[in-house]
Design a protein with these regions (language model features):
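Structural alpha/beta surface segment adjacent to cysteine/selenocysteine redox centers
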Residues: 1-61
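C-terminal cap of thioredoxin/glutaredoxin-like
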Residues: 44-137
Length: 137
């Protein structure tokens, strides 16, 4: 029930910004370590476009963003060399992503987005009332 509520809030929020989210067409939960490694390896000026394309591929078209071919296609569409997408599958890159995730977890961050308001942490998709409560506490 909690996951369903989060999905519904995300879909409604997306609609409000003209961004359709199609959780109903997502058939797999891909391994996202290579996608995270690709974002980390991308030049700063290309990261935002890359992240947008990754999100669109997964949340709007249900693509497997853990697949080498799909990731290479997204990389080139974002202005990156396809070879960089292959580097994202390097075990050392995966280890670096996992280390960053472990560090984040140790800091108490459990989801994205993550907000800390007045000592209170809000993780993942939240009802607007959760923000009001945190801001007025």
């Amino acid at each position: 029930v909690q996951v369903e509520g989060m999905i519904n809030r995300a879909v409604e929020a997306g609609k409000g910004y003209g961004v359709p989210l199609h959780f109903d067409i997502i058939r797999i939960s891909p391994q996202t370590i290579p996608a995270h490694a690709l974002v980390a390896a991308a030049p700063a000026e290309l990261r935002w476009g890359l992240v947008e394309r990754l999100h669109s591929a997964y949340f709007q078209r249900g693509e497997n963003i853990g697949d080498r071919t799909v990731l290479a296609s997204i990389a080139t569409a974002s202005g990156l060399d396809a070879a960089l997408a292959e580097v994202a599958f390097d075990p050392a890159q995966g280890a670096a992503v996992r280390q960053r995730a472990a560090t984040t977890s140790m800091l108490g961050i459990q989801g994205v987005p993550h907000f800390k308001i007045g000592g209170r942490a809000l993780h993942g998709a939240q009802d607007p009332q959760a923000f009001v409560a945190a801001l007025t506490a």
